[in-house]
Structure formats: structure tokens, C-alpha cells
């Protein structure tokens, strides 16, 4: 685990974005942990979040021309990541996001920001079912751009309805790499370093055993 990944876990714990306990997911599964990126909700949170996304993007080595943030959660993430790339990595990358509703005046259309072209890095919080990715792919392809990769905060590394995770399905269907700041394996490695979290470690490992990929 790299230092920025450990720092991200601590950041998520401090903001109660990452919690341990008993949680019922939309899938109906009982999960021993829960991740709610919506609780990164202050200016400082967003500034730090952008730095973690930028760090993981640069670390991945994936080549891209533009950041795309799908409405709505992806919009602030794309914005803060673009700022962090410029401020901390000397990479001035254009960004773009979509509107849910098309507009018939002003800029018009359903895209805001730079023209959607070239190799696109899609940034979002998490991938649960992959539905948002499919919707974004339609927009990207309609504009003649290509998907370079997908960047998220957490890869839960768990099976969907079949044998693959939602992330593995996205990688298979679109031939792109999904980059995550942290994965479930990173989370388990972090818990293993903390004796006071031994009970959470056992629960998360049991969950991985049952649902992991």
C-alpha cells in the first residue's frame, strides 16, 4: 500500500465516509463496512479528495486527454481533480461534465466545459452496477471520443449477480482500465496494521470470503 492510499483511508475514516458495523446494501447483502463519498462535503474535503484522485491517476500511468464527470456526483470530482493535477502535477487537463436535462438556451446541449474529445478519463465516486458508466459511454461515443479509463475512489472487489464484479464487467465490456484510489484489499491491509480494529478485520475478511472476486 502506498502512503497516499493509507492517507486516503484515514481521511475517509475521519470524515465518517468509511464506517464499520452492519449495513444493508442496495443488493440486500449485509456488509461489515459502508462507504459514502457524499460526506466529503466541504471545501477542504474536496481539495483533499482532488489530490488523492490526481495522485492515483498519475500513479496509474494511464494516458488521457480530458476528465469527464458524469452528473451529478462526478461533477465536483472532475473539477477538483483537474485543479489538483494543475496545482500539484503541472498537468493542465481540460474537463467536461454532462447535464441531466438538455438546455435550449445559453450554451445549449447537455455538455458543459471543454469539448468532449480525445481519450477520456471518466471520474466518479464508486461503481455499483455500472449503469452510470453505460450512460456515460453513450455520451462519449456520440461525441466521437474514446474511453481511456475510469477512476473511482473505492473498488469493493465483490461479485455482482454473476462471477465478475461490476468493475470487472466494465473492464471487459469497454476494454478499459478501472483505477481506484483504494481497493478492498488495501482496506484489509490497513485493518491488519491496527490491533484495535481486529474485530472489523475479521468481519471484512469473512465478507470478502463470501462475496469477493
Curated annotation (Swiss-Prot):
Pathway: Pyrimidine metabolism; UMP biosynthesis via de novo pathway; UMP from orotate: step 1/2. 5-phospho-alpha-D-ribose 1-diphosphate binds at residues 26, 72-73, 99-100, 103, 105, 124-132. Keywords: Glycosyltransferase, Magnesium, Pyrimidine biosynthesis, Transferase. Belongs to the purine/pyrimidine phosphoribosyltransferase family. PyrE subfamily. The gene is pyrE. InterPro entries: OPRT (IPR023031), Or_phspho_trans_dom (IPR004467), PRibTrfase_dom (IPR000836), PRTase-like (IPR029057). Its EC number is 2.4.2.10. CDD domains: PRTases_typeI. Catalyzes the transfer of a ribosyl phosphate group from 5-phosphoribose 1-diphosphate to orotate, leading to the formation of orotidine monophosphate (OMP). It comes from Cronobacter sakazakii (strain ATCC BAA-894). This is Orotate phosphoribosyltransferase. Homodimer. Pfam families: Pribosyltran. One of its GO terms (molecular function) is magnesium ion binding. Its cofactor is Mg(2+). GO terms for cellular component: cytoplasm.
Amino acid at each position: 500500500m502506498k502512503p497516499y492510499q493509507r492517507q486516503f483511508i484515514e481521511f475517509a475514516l475521519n470524515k465518517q465516509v468509511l464506517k464499520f458495523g452492519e449495513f444493508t446494501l442496495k443488493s440486500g447483502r449485509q456488509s461489515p463496512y459502508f462507504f459514502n463519498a457524499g460526506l466529503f462535503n466541504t471545501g477542504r474535503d474536496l481539495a483533499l479528495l482532488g489530490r488523492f484522485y490526481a495522485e492515483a491517476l498519475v500513479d496509474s500511468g494511464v494516458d488521457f486527454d480530458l476528465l469527464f464527470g458524469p452528473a451529478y456526483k462526478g461533477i465536483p470530482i472532475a473539477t477538483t481533480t483537474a485543479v489538483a493535477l494543475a496545482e500539484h502535477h503541472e498537468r493542465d487537463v481540460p474537463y467536461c461534465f454532462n447535464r441531466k436535462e438538455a438546455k435550449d438556451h445559453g450554451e445549449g446541449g447537455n455538455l458543459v466545459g471543454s469539448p468532449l474529445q480525445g481519450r477520456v478519463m471518466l471520474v466518479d465516486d464508486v461503481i455499483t452496477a455500472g449503469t452510470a458508466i453505460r450512460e456515460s459511454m453513450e455520451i462519449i461515443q456520440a461525441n466521437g471520443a474514446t474511453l481511456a479509463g475510469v477512476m473511482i475512489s473505492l473498488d469493493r472487489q465483490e461479485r455482482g449477480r454473476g462471477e465478475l464484479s461490476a468493475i470487472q464487467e466494465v473492464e471487459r465490456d469497454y476494454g478499459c482500465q478501472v483505477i481506484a484510489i483504494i481497493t478492498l484489499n488495501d482496506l484489509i491491509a490497513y485493518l491488519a496494521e491496527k490491533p484495535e480494529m481486529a474485530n472489523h478485520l475479521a468481519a471484512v475478511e469473512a465478507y470478502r470470503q463470501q462475496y469477493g472476486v
